[in-house]
Amino acid sequence: MKKQIEQLSAYEPGLSPRALKENYGIKGELHKLASNENLYGPSPKVKEAIQAHLDELQYYPETGSPLIKEAISKHLNIDPARILFGAGLDEVILMISRAVLTPGDKIVTSEMTFGQYYHNAIVESANVVQVPLQNGEFDLDGILSEIDNDTKLVWLCNPNNPTGRYFTHDALRNFLERVPSHIPVIVDEAYVEFATAKDFPDTLALQQEFENAFLLRTFSKAYGLAGMRIGYVIAAKEAIEKYNIIRPPFNVGRLSEYAALAALEDQEYLASIRERNAEEREKFFELSQSDHFYPSQTNFVFVKTDKPHELYEALLNVGCITREFPNGVRITIGFPEQNAKMREVLAQFTL
């Protein structure tokens, strides 16, 4: 066993509704609003596509996910040779880390961001520098100051999970202009389809200028396919060729690929999800306590409080399972009736 693994722990997704009911003696229904899932689910076309291909379960998928790769290349107008798929972004992050990092290498990222950047770097015996957030947002200047000759990867999450904040197009361009061109800057845009800010980065456009700007996207969030595990990286061809060596041969399942194809095709449904989410998100910021919320461009709201466990339990008492952090609670935006219950709790809670 690698010694460095001893300093890590397995991912803990939080207690299930069943376990929470037992622990807290809750009798009524519990709603899972802890994992930033799209509770509306995927497009109806996805279910039709899955049903249409159920007779293929005995076959391995086509290696490399060629159908969805071609569809994404047309949708985003990019060369398919610049795309690599994984079983969710977790696997994509693992493949990149495994392909690039050697013992003693360094990654630079932020504190309080998606934990798999750190986790996979430690597995590869790399050193991790985590720059503190500035009011919930990535400190790009602080990250830049930590980049040196040992730095092999820079991880950015935009919008950031768990805070929901984002950096602008101009901020990202300015950052990329100052990062040495041989160091990959990987921008994780798992929640990009929820973003409505006009100055949100067009990272695809910036890739035309900066070959070291890599982009991660997923079907798990706005597309509603978290259970199907499919995400991808867009990067320079040379990098994709190297990462592809690490990719397991049949990593994305047949049904996952068909589901993603159907979801991508139904952009009208995706737009309706974005609109509903933005409408419900805005209602949280109409509360008088909204100065305790980080501005969000995602399908969740981070509530800052020095009483996170008390707030978590108060929300649990109205049937809403959220995610507790040391300095606050992350609330997934759910259906209107669930959101209304949570806003009522927040309105009465002393943050």
Swiss-Prot record:
<dbReference type="GO" id="GO:0030170">
    <property type="term" value="F:pyridoxal phosphate binding"/>
</dbReference>
<dbReference type="InterPro" id="IPR015424">
    <property type="entry name" value="PyrdxlP-dep_Trfase"/>
</dbReference>
<dbReference type="InterPro" id="IPR004839">
    <property type="entry name" value="Aminotransferase_I/II_large"/>
</dbReference>
<dbReference type="InterPro" id="IPR005861">
    <property type="entry name" value="HisP_aminotrans"/>
</dbReference>
<dbReference type="InterPro" id="IPR050106">
    <property type="entry name" value="HistidinolP_aminotransfase"/>
</dbReference>
<dbReference type="InterPro" id="IPR015422">
    <property type="entry name" value="PyrdxlP-dep_Trfase_small"/>
</dbReference>
<keyword id="KW-0032">Aminotransferase</keyword>
<dbReference type="InterPro" id="IPR015421">
    <property type="entry name" value="PyrdxlP-dep_Trfase_major"/>
</dbReference>
<comment type="similarity">
    <text>Belongs to the class-II pyridoxal-phosphate-dependent aminotransferase family. Histidinol-phosphate aminotransferase subfamily.</text>
</comment>
<keyword id="KW-0663">Pyridoxal phosphate</keyword>
<comment type="subunit">
    <text>Homodimer.</text>
</comment>
<dbReference type="GO" id="GO:0000105">
    <property type="term" value="P:L-histidine biosynthetic process"/>
</dbReference>
<dbReference type="GO" id="GO:0004400">
    <property type="term" value="F:histidinol-phosphate transaminase activity"/>
</dbReference>
<keyword id="KW-0368">Histidine biosynthesis</keyword>
<keyword id="KW-0808">Transferase</keyword>
<keyword id="KW-0028">Amino-acid biosynthesis</keyword>
<protein>
    <recommendedName>
        <fullName>Histidinol-phosphate aminotransferase</fullName>
        <ecNumber>2.6.1.9</ecNumber>
    </recommendedName>
</protein>
<feature type="modified residue" description="N6-(pyridoxal phosphate)lysine">
    <location>
        <position position="221"/>
    </location>
</feature>
<comment type="pathway">
    <text>Amino-acid biosynthesis; L-histidine biosynthesis; L-histidine from 5-phospho-alpha-D-ribose 1-diphosphate: step 7/9.</text>
</comment>
<dbReference type="Pfam" id="PF00155">
    <property type="entry name" value="Aminotran_1_2"/>
</dbReference>
<dbReference type="InterPro" id="IPR001917">
    <property type="entry name" value="Aminotrans_II_pyridoxalP_BS"/>
</dbReference>
